[in-house]
Amino acid sequence: KTLVEDNQLEAVINLPSGVFKPYAGVATAILIFTKGGQTDEVWFYDLQNDGYSLDDKRNPIKDNDLPHLLASWKHYRTLRGLPVDNFMGEKLASLLKQQYPEGIDAGVDFKDRTQAAFIVPKEDIAAQKYDLSINRYKEVVYQAEEYEDPKVILKRLKDLEKEILADLDELEGML
């Protein structure tokens, strides 16, 4: 509550669970805030991949959301007319160009809570008793799964069972 009411909480960056393995496997987040000031809205980012595996070895992997995170943060601050530091090194800029050759969509307004980056008004955070867990605010979109008719699946299983029994009879005849 103090971070939101008595300071300017600017961002909550949700890190993947296990990012600090082998030391700790707990869920963590980075909070960006300015002492004093006031919070009007908070920018959330759900970081899925940090460029390393989430096991104890932490080997490099292809998926890396860090360039997108930094570019989105820069874009958000630019849209709000806030100062933007050039904090992206050559390596991250190169990764960003590889993953997003067209760049970050300039049409993004961060209101869509199904995306990796979105904003939450202070009022919504207060209504959630100042809980900064990203799962309180991010909307999950479920894909509808379509399955074949159960009768078709059952018939296919029966046919497979007949084939297996025939193969077992043939195998038994060889003994």
Q: Could you tell me what each predicted segment is?
A:
Residues K1-M174:
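A conserved structural/catalytic subdomain of Rossmann-like adenosyl-cofactor enzymes
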